[in-house]
Amino acid sequence: VTAFQVDHDPVRPAVGYRFDWKGRSVVVSGDTALSANLTQNASGADVLVGESLAANLVGMGRQAALAQGNSRMAKILADIPDYHATPVEMAQMAREAGAKLLVYSHHV
C-alpha cells in the first residue's frame, strides 16, 4: 500500500492510496482536484476509484444557501469546485494515466 499526496487545499494533508498485489493495482484518489501526482500514481492502474463533482448540484446548493441568507454555507459551496474533480476531468486523467477502469465515488 502506497499513500501519496493529493490536492485538496485548504485541507492538508490529503492523501490517495495505491494498492498493488500480485501484478494488479487499485488506486483510490480520495478528495482531490487533478494533479500531476495523482496522474503519476494512477499510472497503469487496473482500477482507479476517483471522486467526482457534480458542479451543477453544488451550484444549486449555493443558490439555496444564498436565498436563505446563509453566506457561510454559500462560501463553502462556492469553494468546493476548487478542490474536487469533475467526472470529465477524472475520466481524462484516467485515460492519460492509462488506468484500465474508472469507478466514480464520493459524488459531491
Question: Each predicted region: which residue ranges?
Answer:
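Flexible, acidic/histidine-containing loops and adjacent segments that form or flank the divalent-metal
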Residues: 2-13, 21-24
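N-terminal post-signal-peptidase region of extra-cytosolic proteins
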Residues: 3, 29-32
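Cap/insert and terminal regions of metallo-dependent hydrolase folds
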Residues: 16, 25, 33-108
